[in-house]
Amino acid sequence: MKTTKALSIFMLVFALLLGACQRNVTRNGDGSADVETIVTQQELQEAVNASVADPLIKELTVSLQSGYILVSGTRERLNDSSKTDTLSFRIDLGVSNGQLTSTISDAQFDGFTIEQNRLDLWNTTIANRIAKLGQKSPNSTLDSVSITTSEVTMTWTVSK
């Protein structure tokens, strides 16, 4: 009875973990596996919102374009919350040494360039959060990432 209960709990937890994003697995002859994970626009929206983590930034919207991600929103002014500035930036995702990279460009508050140290922090946290959505094994390396108007697809090699 205990074994059946433990197995049922394990299967439930496993199903919940797999439900986070879609994945396809292909076994290779050397014992490794190629895993393709798909991250939805909603999952990206949540990852970018959490990465920006600025209480003054409101209504952040993630829009998937062919090859990149467009982000827009508003930011309350620190000295006058009744006034807002528009925020926009582009995110390009890539792969370097088996890890996901994020590169923000064209980042502006009301036409003024956003400071680089803020962009560096956002790049790091965005890449880490999106990678966590797709990478489910610590012994995996990212091979490729692609962005379409409906999803982000990452292909990983998982070694045994």
Stretches found by the model and what they are:
Residues 21-160:
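Extracellular/lumenal and peripheral-membrane lipid-interaction modules
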